């Protein structure tokens, strides 16, 4: 049933495949590299795969889209836009320098590179191929990524001891005296906190931006790359399945198997 549907609706299946590929592209396009900065320090964000002087680079900030422009590098000239929110500088090496950062600097920064240099053709980039890279900057007092703290519950151990004592006098009347002594021992261990240690973070961030790492946990950049790899693998699998169904390979194999088994030739309904 599925084979017949795909055979009779090839165009719809192809459109659906194109939509899936476009959605995956948008997801990968909007994925940003996490970067952390400490209040009062400078943070440098680097453009990637730039070959001066023909390549052009644009820096902007803001969530989604083109955002607000900061710098434009065109050949040997640099254009800097006035901005009252940030104190920044456009460096000659196509990098963006954020000066004396505060929590207000915590936002998304994007760089778009127009690869016009002929050397990019070696990598099959083609003409006017653009490479977009974005950084998700987080600024705090420690200059480290937020860590989680777990608190163990307090345990109390109670121990009770009972002692019985009998006293007898010289009279004929015997008096039994029972004394109960209770001793209670309380054990109150101090609560333990498991806090992941802070790691040093390099503020000069490029394409190989390194995020703060915690013990037994992958870094945010590794998680970022792993997510990209999974999306690419999913797209490749979907494309392979669509190609197999588009050329009716399962149906042809089924007819070939019927011919070898029964010695008859079956004509598919799509060829009638």
Swiss-Prot record:
GO cellular component, one term: host cell endoplasmic reticulum
Signal peptide: 1-31
Alphabetical UniProt keywords: Glycoprotein, Host cell membrane, Host endoplasmic reticulum, Host membrane, Membrane, Signal, Transmembrane, Transmembrane helix
Keyword 4Fe-4S attached: no
Intervals, Extracellular compartment: 32-224
Transmembrane segments: 225-245
Compartments, record wording: Host cell membrane; Host endoplasmic reticulum
Lineage: superkingdom: Viruses
Manganese listed as a keyword: no
InterPro entries, per database record: Ig-like_dom_sf (IPR036179), Ig-like_fold (IPR013783)
Compositionally biased intervals (Low complexity): 147-183
Membrane-topology descriptor: Single-pass type I membrane protein
Chain positions covered by the region annotation Disordered: 142-200
Record-stated family: Belongs to the RL11 family.
Subunit and interaction comment: Interacts with host PTPRC; this interaction affects T-cell signaling.
This protein's name: Protein UL11
Gene behind this protein: UL11
């Amino acid at each position: 049933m599925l084979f017949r549907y795909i055979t009779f609706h090839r165009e719809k299946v192809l459109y659906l495949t194109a939509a899936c590929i476009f959605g995956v592209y948008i997801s990968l396009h909007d994925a940003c590299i996490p970067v952390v900065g400490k209040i009062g320090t400078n943070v440098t964000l680097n453009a990637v795969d730039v070959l001066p002087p023909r390549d052009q680079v644009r820096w902007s900030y803001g969530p989604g889209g083109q955002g607000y422009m900061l710098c434009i590098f065109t050949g040997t000239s640099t254009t800097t836009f006035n901005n009252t929110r940030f104190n920044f500088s456009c460096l000659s090496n196509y990098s963006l320098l954020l000066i004396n950062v505060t929590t207000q600097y915590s936002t998304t920064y994007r760089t778009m590179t127009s690869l016009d240099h002929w050397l990019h053709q070696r990598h099959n980039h083609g003409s006017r191929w653009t490479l977009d890279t974005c950084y998700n900057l987080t600024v705090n007092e420690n200059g480290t990524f937020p860590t989680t703290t777990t608190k163990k519950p307090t345990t109390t151990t109670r121990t009770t001891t009972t002692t019985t004592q009998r006293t007898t006098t010289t009279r004929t009347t015997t008096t039994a005296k029972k004394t109960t002594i209770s001793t209670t021992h309380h054990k109150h261990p101090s609560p333990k906190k498991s806090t992941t240690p802070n790691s040093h973070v390099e503020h000069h961030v490029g394409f190989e931006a390194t995020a703060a790492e915690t013990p037994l946990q992958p870094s945010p950049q590794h998680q970022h790359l792993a997510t990209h790899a999974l999306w690419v693998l999913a797209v490749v699998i979907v494309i392979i399945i669509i190609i197999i169904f588009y050329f009716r390979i399962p149906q042809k194999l089924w007819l070939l198997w019927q011919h070898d088994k029964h010695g008859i030739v079956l004509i598919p309904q799509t060829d009638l």
